[in-house]
Amino acid sequence: MLIPHHLLEAETLTRLIEDFVTREGTDNGEETPLESRVLRVRQALERGEALILFEPDSQQCQLVAKRDVPKEWLD
């Protein structure tokens, strides 16, 4: 299930983004400040390039690129 980012409380959204950008595998080899990485993801959400996916079975949220979401989920 896709969750519109604007429906989350600001603090919840920030924590979700921070969790995403600090995970293993998201490091691009450069020393980019946390604030910059959070801002980039927040802007991608605002532009609709990234989405929040909620998995009911696991009760987990994850950030995904829109291009990776099945088209039928976007309708």
From Swiss-Prot:
It comes from Azotobacter vinelandii (strain DJ / ATCC BAA-1303). This is UPF0270 protein Avin_35000. The lineage of its organism: Bacteria, Pseudomonadati, Pseudomonadota, Gammaproteobacteria, Pseudomonadales. It holds the Pfam family UPF0270. It comes from the Bacteria. Signal peptide: none annotated. Belongs to the UPF0270 family.
